[in-house]
Amino acid sequence: MTESTFSQYPRLVLSKGREKSLLRRHPWVFSGAVSRLEGKANLGETIDIVDHQGKWLARGAWSPASQIRARVWTFDKAESIDIAFFTRRLRQAQQWRDWLAKKDGLDSYRLIAGESDGLPGVTIDRFGHFLVLQLLSAGAEYQRAALISALQTCYPDCAIYDRSDVAVRKKEGMALTQGPVTGELPPALLPIEEHGMKLLVDIQGGHKTGYYLDQRDSRLATRRYVENQRVLNCFSYTGGFAVSALMGGCRQVVSVDTSQDALDIARQNVELNQLDLSKAEFVRDDVFKLLRAYREHGEKFDVIIMDPPKFVENKSQLMGACRGYKDINMLAIQLLNPGGILLTFSCSGLMTSDLFQKIIADAAIDAGRDVQFIEQFRQAADHPVIATYPEGLYLKGFACRVM
């Protein structure tokens, strides 16, 4: 590829002194760093990013409606963005996931974790022979055809299903899309296996791509704390933690969620694993309200699992999210018997591990209890975090012993 060919790309010129993050290979360019766009670029189209003197820095995708004006595809000037590019990225990701799948006996895993796999705005989860695709950025959508072609090359025997029906697409001026791309339609509930559990996944209608694969290791870790214990499983979704708790020998597990459909699948998951259904209770309720009601009625638990949805989407919401996390963890701490275990998580990328730990400490003070941090959690290894993109470490959690 010649330099003259590269010059055909529109150029995004950065303001003076705003190239430092790109020199450190961070994959985002924020609106405040942009001086001007030279040439015309459509939504999601490939552009070259240069400093204020015209020095080439990266090649990325243009998104004029987003606070993230450009997401970097490559820091290699010789690399063009085409089917071969996406095939290379997929092969790199495939190598790691194939090793993990063989090592841990996985039939389902995250194949592409966005920026950390060099494909910003692209999420791909594999469930058996189904690949579930989410395109979350303008650049990813613009390259849809090339990406799907690369997927078919790397996974010729897999069906592809699109779950790009997430609200974040609206921020970049894109419509929501969902439906089969290639191959057959996924069944209403697809069985997968995870650490000895059989679990039903709703690819077409479930949260995100159908199941939270990132919590795989945390669900397994739960088993060491639950033998003969009474467990409260908050924001239970389809019951992965509940099934794991029952496999760990818990005395009872109460699963709470606002979705009756999710609770119905959770019940089916307990039955599918031939576990004692009499030890499992399913409650459709708002977790905040129910915890306060439990406190009022003197309910107590030995283990509480707190795995809420994302409380914060942007920095302006961070303070409110901190209050929400503090309130809900304070309530959980108050409901635990002395020596009880709180397994608490945050999936908000803007919530750092240090800040989350401080929130738990503050919640313990407000609850009037002493808390020991005994274990730390993060997303499973099929959700890697590239060193230049710390935002990729979005899931964090702690096991806490409440005195």
Swiss-Prot record:
<dbReference type="Pfam" id="PF17785">
    <property type="entry name" value="PUA_3"/>
</dbReference>
<dbReference type="InterPro" id="IPR002478">
    <property type="entry name" value="PUA"/>
</dbReference>
<feature type="domain" description="PUA">
    <location>
        <begin position="9"/>
        <end position="88"/>
    </location>
</feature>
<comment type="function">
    <text>Specifically methylates the cytosine at position 1962 (m5C1962) of 23S rRNA.</text>
</comment>
<keyword id="KW-0489">Methyltransferase</keyword>
<comment type="similarity">
    <text>Belongs to the methyltransferase superfamily. RlmI family.</text>
</comment>
<dbReference type="InterPro" id="IPR019614">
    <property type="entry name" value="SAM-dep_methyl-trfase"/>
</dbReference>
<keyword id="KW-0949">S-adenosyl-L-methionine</keyword>
<dbReference type="InterPro" id="IPR036974">
    <property type="entry name" value="PUA_sf"/>
</dbReference>
<dbReference type="InterPro" id="IPR015947">
    <property type="entry name" value="PUA-like_sf"/>
</dbReference>
<dbReference type="Pfam" id="PF10672">
    <property type="entry name" value="Methyltrans_SAM"/>
</dbReference>
<dbReference type="GO" id="GO:0003723">
    <property type="term" value="F:RNA binding"/>
</dbReference>
<keyword id="KW-0963">Cytoplasm</keyword>
<dbReference type="GO" id="GO:0005737">
    <property type="term" value="C:cytoplasm"/>
</dbReference>
<protein>
    <recommendedName>
        <fullName>Ribosomal RNA large subunit methyltransferase I</fullName>
        <ecNumber>2.1.1.191</ecNumber>
    </recommendedName>
</protein>
<dbReference type="InterPro" id="IPR029063">
    <property type="entry name" value="SAM-dependent_MTases_sf"/>
</dbReference>
<dbReference type="GO" id="GO:0016434">
    <property type="term" value="F:rRNA (cytosine) methyltransferase activity"/>
</dbReference>
<keyword id="KW-0808">Transferase</keyword>
<keyword id="KW-0694">RNA-binding</keyword>
<dbReference type="InterPro" id="IPR023542">
    <property type="entry name" value="RLMI"/>
</dbReference>
<dbReference type="InterPro" id="IPR041532">
    <property type="entry name" value="RlmI-like_PUA"/>
</dbReference>
<keyword id="KW-0698">rRNA processing</keyword>
